């Protein structure tokens, strides 16, 4: 029986599938798998199930001389050297569609949380309390009727747009390609990045990360935004220059931010933790029972397909 190495615990539905077709070795230690353990694990393995937090670099790929597939448990894949994997004729797959609804739900949840100061209000209610209802007390911003600017109208961005339309929001989007069919379906308008930054009341980042996207949102971009804008990032941390974001918040150049991802993840900049107009969540975009179960089935089936000589779904290289 061929071996699969699983770089961390995954839901049982996927693990059982793997156990039916492979000798399964899984990292069960505390925290993230370290490089030496990963290199040891991929030796003699035909398939690797990697997590978003698993750094699969050239050294790891070279150690996995028998690898046919690296099935990444997540929609993103910037944790893997996909070009080098291609050179080695190793398929790399991801789990794109499984994350769509969960991540879109969280994105809109972050919009509401930061605009209506929900987390801040929860903390107040649990600590000092409040003196009762008052006309000027704890005001936030309404979402309905505002303009949302979506960076990246892929599967997740489109799902965010549909939810935003249910709030009677006007939808702007930007990306490398115009998507006229989706524009008609959703009621979205394509604009360039600068126009989106200048006109949106809420900016959500839902684009996939690649090196060209690094620090797409930096000091110059913050200066283009409305002073009342909220920035929401549920994609990848390095798309936003985190120190520039901190400065924009401190200088009141923008009204608030809600982040599920971080530039130096899992580390979170201390300044972000100290600001009341920032909502922080621990990279839980697709952290639902439904999504995570589906993701585990997708990676398991991809690995099974690869060892059976079939082309797996969702190859990214």
UniProtKB/Swiss-Prot annotation:
Pfam families: 2-Hacid_dh, 2-Hacid_dh_C. One of its GO terms (molecular function) is NAD binding. SUPFAM superfamilies: Formate/glycerate dehydrogenase catalytic domain-like, NAD(P)-binding Rossmann-fold domains. The active site is at 236, 265, 283 (proton donor). The keyword Transferase does not apply. NAD(+) binds at residues 155-156, 234-236, 260, 283-286. Keywords: NAD, Oxidoreductase. It comes from the Bacteria. Its EC number is 1.1.1.-. InterPro entries: D-2-hydroxyacid_DH (IPR050857), D-isomer_2_OHA_DH_cat_dom (IPR006139), D-isomer_DH_NAD-bd (IPR006140), NAD(P)-bd_dom_sf (IPR036291). It is an enzyme of class 1 (oxidoreductase). Belongs to the D-isomer specific 2-hydroxyacid dehydrogenase family. PANTHER family: D-ISOMER SPECIFIC 2-HYDROXYACID DEHYDROGENASE FAMILY PROTEIN (AFU_ORTHOLOGUE AFUA_6G10090). This is Putative 2-hydroxyacid dehydrogenase SA2098. It comes from Staphylococcus aureus (strain N315). The lineage of its organism: Bacteria, Bacillati, Bacillota, Bacilli, Bacillales.
């Amino acid at each position: 029986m061929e071996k699969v190495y699983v770089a961390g615990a995954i839901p049982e539905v996927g693990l059982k599938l793997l156990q039916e077709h492979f000798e399964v070795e899984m990292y069960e230690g505390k925290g993230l798998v370290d490089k030496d353990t990963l290199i040891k694990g991929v030796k003699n393995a035909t398939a690797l199930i990697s997590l978003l937090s698993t750094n699969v670099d050239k050294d790891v790929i070279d150690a996995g001389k028998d690898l046919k597939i690296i099935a990444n448990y997540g929609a993103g894949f910037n944790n893997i050297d996909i070009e080098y994997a291609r050179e080695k004729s190793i398929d790399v797959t991801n789990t794109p569609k499984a994350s769509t609804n969960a991540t879109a739900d969280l994105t809109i949840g972050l919009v509401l949380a930061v605009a209506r100061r929900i987390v801040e209000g929860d903390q107040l209610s649990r600590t000092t309390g409040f003196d009762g209802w008052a006309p000027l007390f704890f005001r936030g911003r309404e979402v309905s009727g505002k303009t949302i600017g979506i960076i990246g109208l892929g599967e997740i961005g489109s799902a965010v747009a549909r939810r935003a339309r249910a709030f009677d929001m006007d939808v702007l989007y930007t990306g490398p390609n115009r998507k006229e069919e989706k524009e008609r379906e959703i009621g979205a308008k394509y604009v360039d990045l600068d126009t989106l930054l200048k006109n949106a009341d809420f900016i959500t980042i839902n684009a996939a990360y690649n090196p060209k996207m690094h620090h797409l949102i930096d000091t110059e971009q913050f200066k283009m935004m409305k002073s009342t804008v909220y920035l929401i990032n549920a994609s990848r941390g390095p798309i936003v220059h985190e120190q520039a974001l901190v400065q924009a918040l401190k200088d009141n150049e923008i009204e608030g931010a809600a982040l599920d991802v971080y530039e130096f993840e899992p580390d979170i900049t201390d300044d972000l933790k100290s600001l009341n107009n920032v909502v922080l969540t621990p990279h839980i975009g697709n952290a639902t029972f439904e999504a995570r179960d589906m993701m585990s089935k997708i990676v398991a089936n991809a690995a099974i397909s690869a060892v059976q000589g079939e082309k797996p779904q969702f190859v990214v290289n």
